[in-house]
Amino acid sequence: MDDTYTINVTPDKRFSGREIGDIAVAMVVLSIAFVILYRDSQFMWYLGYAYGDVARWPILIVTCFGLVFFSFLLHEFGHKFTAQNFGLRSEFRMSRIGLFITLITSLLGFLFAAPGAVVINGYPCLLYTSDAAVNIVLAMVGIVGCFAFNHTPLVFVFLMLANLNAFLAFFNLLPIPPLDGSKILAWNAPVYVAAMAVAALE
């Protein structure tokens, strides 16, 4: 990858202007990728059945953007605020190549979600489990919501919340550098196996 990650963070500042911009671009690209990925899925069939062929596209787009923004922000907050609790600095940096790969793979029917990475001025591996934990919890919320709101229009939102976050957790835990899974496995194999098992079950 030809992207160069740099970090220049004021210690008492939560987010820099560049980080906010990088997060915004990454969220938009990832949202578009999920819309492309779900375009021929059972989600679209359900939306067409429930709301008609014309309405299903705007509903899918709004839902994907809303859930990706919500899930991605909490995912990155997991990194940032955990790092700050350790007295460390962290910032998200988008990857142009990663964003391109994310879009191209979604067109091919699968998703390699690599919009960027979090740069941390330290290496406490507990930090690398925090974002996956956020996605696992959100997936569980989605599953519970599916049961609680079954046979209502909201079941679609919770089903997509569960599907999207289970995917993000599982993908991020793959033991492939530079994904967090490779760092967690090198740090503590039992923790990695437990986290991956939970993500896979969801």
Language-model-derived ranges and their functions:
Residues 1-202:
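Hydrophobic transmembrane alpha-helices and their immediate loop junctions
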